[in-house]
Design a protein with these regions (language model features):
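Conserved beta-strand segments of alpha/beta enzyme cores
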Residues: 36-38, 56, 70, 110, ...
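Active-site environment of divalent metal-dependent phosphoester hydrolases
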Residues: 10-12, 43-50, 78-84, 94-106, ...
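Core catalytic region of metal-dependent phosphoesterases/phosphodiesterases
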Residues: 1-66
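Active-site neighborhood of phospho(di)ester-bond hydrolases with catalytic His/Asp-centered motifs
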Residues: 2-7, 37-43, 72-75, 92-97, ...
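Short linear motifs in intrinsically disordered
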Residues: 51-57, 92-93, 119-121, 130-133
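Internal catalytic-core helix/loop-beta-alpha segment
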Residues: 54-102
Length: 159
């Protein structure tokens, strides 16, 4: 599965769009992959976007379970480490919104932000996060070229 954390086609008037940014091409590519996608709504996603996408994007959050841990995925404009959703000890909060990759413990929980594939900020690379529960380092931050630049171990996630 591919989890998209919002702002699927457009990133709002505050962000300059990079050269080559082509939302219609993104739309076509994502619609072809619709059976593999799970999405949450970003602060720039609208009902108009939903009209052209063939998979749901307007859920405020998604909750799923991995190896006995709850993962709460949301865009990040409402729920984030500063204003967390109701979490139990050991839960993982997964956000986008800032376009800056981050990871680490907060309180009794763990936080992950994959950054952005299209409009990264704070000199971070265009990139994404791979979550592979079968790996000794289940979290890998990668550039668009596929280069892993940061991993998070099981021990770090367990803190």
């Amino acid at each position: 599965r591919l989890l998209l954390l919002g702002d699927i086609l457009y990133h709002g008037p505050r962000n300059d769009l990079p050269d080559g940014y082509a939302p219609k091409e993104v739309l076509a590519m994502l619609n072809e992959m619709r059976e593999e996608l799970l999405c949450v709504r970003g602060n720039c996603d609208t009902e108009v976007d939903q009209m052209v996408l063939q998979f749901p994007i307007l859920a405020d959050y998604a909750v799923f379970f991995l190896n006995g841990r709850t993962v709460y995925a949301t865009h990040g404009h409402n729920y984030n480490p500063q204003t967390p959703p109701p979490l139990k000890k050991g839960d993982i909060l997964l956000n986008g919104h800032t376009h800056v990759p981050k990871w680490g413990a907060f309180g009794e929980n763990f936080y992950l932000n994959p950054g952005s594939v299209s409009i990264p900020k704070e000199q971070s690379p265009r990139g994404y996060l791979i979550w592979d529960e079968e790996s000794e380092t289940p979290i890998a931050f990668r550039t668009l070229q596929g280069e892993t630049w940061k991993t998070v171990s099981r021990e770090e996630l367990a803190k």
